[in-house]
Structures are given as C-alpha cells and as structure tokens.
Amino acid sequence: MANIKSALKRIEIAERNRLQNKSYKSAIKTLMKKTFQSVEAYASDPNPEKLDTINTSMAAAFSKIDKAVKCKVIHKNNAARKKARLAKALQSALPAA
C-alpha cells in the first residue's frame, strides 16, 4: 500500500474511475441485450410496434456507446464493432426489399 499522499489519492481516483467505467460498460451490455431481444421478437412476429421498439432501444444503445467513447471508457474501434453488430442484427431481421 502506498504511503505518499499523492499516490493514495491516485489509488482513490483509480477506484472511482473503475467503478464508473464498470457502470458504463454494464449499461451498454444491458442495452445491447435488450436490442437483440427486440430484434428476435420482431423476427418471429414482424409488426410496426415491435419495429418502433427496436428503433428506440437501438438509439439508446448507440447513444450510450457514443457517450462511452467520449468519456474514454471504451475505444472508438470497440464502439464501432458494437454498433456494427447491432446494425447487422437489425438488417438480418428486416425483410429484403
């Protein structure tokens, strides 16, 4: 354990940031799961209300992912990969037109 005052402070800051980052990442995972579940529900029974639910949950997930990049919680390439997975899931559920 550190004895220097500045080192002790850095330990506290690192722990605080770790918990905030963990919260952000958990929220992103939850929103992604919710979006994937909405897409599966739409694929089994397509109707406009379920499509609205997908769009709402996808917008929330994209927003949270972008905010995480802005706060440097996740890397921009990681965010791009997550957003691409969500978009690909939606495209696979939509009928080819």
From Swiss-Prot:
A Pfam family that this protein carries is Ribosomal_S20p
Q: Per its record, what are the GO molecular function terms? A: small ribosomal subunit rRNA binding; structural constituent of ribosome
- Could you tell me the superkingdom of the organism this chain comes from? Bacteria
Which keywords appear in this protein's UniProt record, sorted alphabetically?
Answer: Ribonucleoprotein, Ribosomal protein, RNA-binding, rRNA-binding
Q: Name one GO cellular component term.
A: small ribosomal subunit
Q: GO biological process: any one?
A: translation
Q: Per the similarity annotation, which family is this?
A: Belongs to the bacterial ribosomal protein bS20 family.
Q: What does this protein do?
A: Binds directly to 16S ribosomal RNA.
Q: What is this protein called?
A: Small ribosomal subunit protein bS20
Q: Which organism is it from?
A: Synechocystis sp. (strain ATCC 27184 / PCC 6803 / Kazusa)
